[in-house]
A protein has these predicted regions:
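Extended, well-folded catalytic/binding cores that form a central cleft or groove in large enzyme
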Residues: 176-179, 201
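C-terminal catalytic domain of photolyase/cryptochrome flavoproteins
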Residues: 4-177, 191-192, 210-237
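Non-catalytic terminal regions of proteins
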Residues: 172, 184-186, 198-199, 203-205, ...
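Acidic beta-strand-to-loop metal/phosphate-binding motif
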Residues: 178-195
Length: 237
C-alpha cells in the first residue's frame, strides 16, 4: 500500500505499470489480487485515494524516520506536490526467461494431471497414478511476466511433486503429445482454454454468492467464520 501510494498518488504514475513491476517480483504473486490492491489504493472504485504520512509508516513498520517529504500532517499531505525523488517514471520492459527442458516421457496408459504456475499443490490428486506435467505456457508469461527468482521458486516447488515433468509450450502443443488420455487440471481464470476434467479450487467461503457492498462489509459478515476455519488447535499451534 505504501509503495502504491508513493508511486501513483504522490508520484502520479498510472497504477498499471508499477503493479506489473511488483507482480514481476512477487514469489507468491497473483495478478488479480495484486492489480485490484493497486486500484484500491489509487481510488479506482471509490475516488478516495489512500495516503499515509511518516507517522503512520513509522508506527506500522517500527521505524523512527523523520524530516522526510512525508513527515507532515494529513491536511498538508493531501495537497503535497510530487517531490523531485518521485518525478521520473520508467518505461518498463519486463520479460521472463523460461527454463530449458528435456523431452517429456508420457505413459499412454495413465491419465494426465496438468500443473502450472498457479497450481503446484503436492496434495492435489496425490493418490492417483498419473503422468504429472508442469505446463509452462510462453503466452501466459508474455502477458504476465515474472522474474528469474519467481521461475526458480516455481521450479523448486515443483520438486515436491513426485514424478513431475516440465513442458514449455501451449496446451494444444502438449495435447498433441498425448494419446487421448483423460486430462485433469485445477480451475483458474488463466486455464479457460484447457480441455479435460476441471477440479474446482477450494474456496475459503464456499457458499459466498451474490457478493455486494464493500470489502470491509463482506469481511465483517464473514470474519468469525474465516477465523474459526483457520484457527490453530492443539498440536497445530
Amino acid at each position: 500500500m505504501y509503495t502504491a501510494f508513493l508511486s501513483c498518488n504522490l508520484g502520479k504514475s498510472h497504477w498499471l505499470q508499477p503493479a506489473k513491476w511488483m507482480y514481476y517480483h512477487l514469489l507468491d504473486g497473483d495478478w488479480g489480487s495484486n492489480a485490484l490492491s493497486w486500484q484500491w489504493v489509487v481510488g479506482s472504485f471509490s475516488h478516495k485515494k489512500y495516503i499515509a504520512n511518516q507517522e503512520n509508516i513509522n508506527y506500522y513498520t517500527n521505524h523512527k524516520q523523520s524530516n522526510t517529504f512525508l513527515d507532515v500532517d494529513y491536511e498538508k499531505l493531501a495537497l503535497l506536490e510530487t517531490p523531485p525523488q518521485l518525478k521520473e517514471i520508467e518505461n518498463l520492459k519486463l520479460t521472463t526467461q523460461l527454463p530449458i527442458t528435456n523431452e517429456i516421457n508420457i505413459d499412454p496408459n495413465l491419465p494426465v494431471l496438468i500443473y502450472n504456475y498457479y497450481n503446484l499443490s503436492p496434495t492435489w490428486r496425490a493418490e492417483m497414478k498419473a503422468n504429472r506435467i508442469l505446463l509452462i505456457e510462453p503466452d501466459i508469461f508474455k502477458a504476465y511476466p515474472v522474474s528469474d527468482q519467481c521461475i526458480s521458486f516455481m521450479m523448486k516447488l515443483s520438486k515436491n511433486i513426485d514424478g513431475i515433468q516440465v513442458f514449455v509450450g501451449n496446451f494444444l502443443e502438449l495435447k498433441t503429445k498425448l494419446s487421448g488420455q483423460t486430462i485433469y487440471f485445477m480451475e483458474h481464470p488463466l486455464n479457460s482454454h484447457y480441455e479435460g476434467i476441471e477440479d474446482e479450487r477450494e474456496w475459503i467461503i464456499p457458499d459466498a454468492v451474490n457478493i455486494k457492498g464493500s470489502y470491509f462489509s463482506f469481511w465483517k459478515k464473514n470474519e468469525q467464520y474465516i477465523k474459526g476455519r483457520f484457527e490453530l488447535k492443539g498440536d497445530q499451534c
